[in-house]
Amino acid sequence: MSLLLDKLDRAAERFVQPLGFGGSAKREPVSPILVLGAFEANGGSQPQKTKKELLDGAVIRTTNTTKKSVLEKTTKSLGDLMFGTWSESPQAALTKGADFEIFSSPLTSLAVLSDNDRTFIMNIELSLDEGLIRTIDVLPVSGFVIQLNNVPQLTLEHLMQIGRISTATSKPVFLHLSSIPSEADLSSLRDIGIAALIVELENNSDDAFMKLNKALKNMPQKPNERENRKVNSSSPYTLNKDTTDVTPDDNDEWDDD
């Protein structure tokens, strides 16, 4: 399983049980929204030590001119930090060691996407036709990226644009931003269905990422999250409230018409 998908599952749970014995061990908080730092393979903005500790992963943007040697040097500098690539179309030759691949072209071959050993995330336009939006949940990808770049502040219109996509799919939706959103916006982004933020490293300081990390971990759970955790832990079946056994007895008499 992709490490990214595993982290998304953990984020949905909000808390993880640390290693150890006994039920008294304190459960560690997990950010409800992942934070991935984005930078160009040919640029010099890859994360330094401080930012690495504040990120859940990195996204390396590549182009048709990105050399394999340059990408290998870049990924080596990331150490153990999970990373993925972002290109116009999936490029197997440039994805050695990558946990996931983001691509933008709707003309990508289905044969490429049939490789079960790779995790594909598709970048889609917010302006996508309503009819096409209804089809995205059945596409052979693991999630979607939408972009709001050069936005000074988030507005209700932005939330409605995001909601057109997030409410049309059960798969995780990532939001790509030039700048880190304000703390006041984070709850709205979570509630509208954003699973991860992809934030440009070049535009944001270590201090800004530190504040984001703290704000996400301190974000209160939604009431229905607490209730769902309670329900799911008490019963494996939650769809039907009526658990009466309706299986007919072998000795029941049935009237013949």
Feature-to-residue mapping (PLM):
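ATP/nucleotide-binding catalytic cores
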Residues: 98, 122, 137-142, 148, ...
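Catalytic cores of alpha/beta
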Residues: 46-50, 89-97, 127-138, 179-197
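C-terminal helical cap(s) of enzyme catalytic domains, especially alpha/beta-barrels
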Residues: 203-256
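Hydrophobic faces of well-ordered beta-strands that scaffold small-molecule active sites
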Residues: 31-40, 56-62, 79-87, 100-103, ...
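Conserved N-terminal beta1-alpha1 strand-loop-helix module at the mouth
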Residues: 1-83, 246-257
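Flexible, charged surface loops at secondary-structure boundaries
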Residues: 28-31, 49-54, 75-78, 93-97, ...
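Active-site-adjacent beta->alpha loops and helix N-cap segments on the catalytic face
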Residues: 62-78, 88-92, 100-118, 128-132, ...
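Short, basic, helix/turn surface patches
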Residues: 85-90, 128-135, 173-176, 221-234
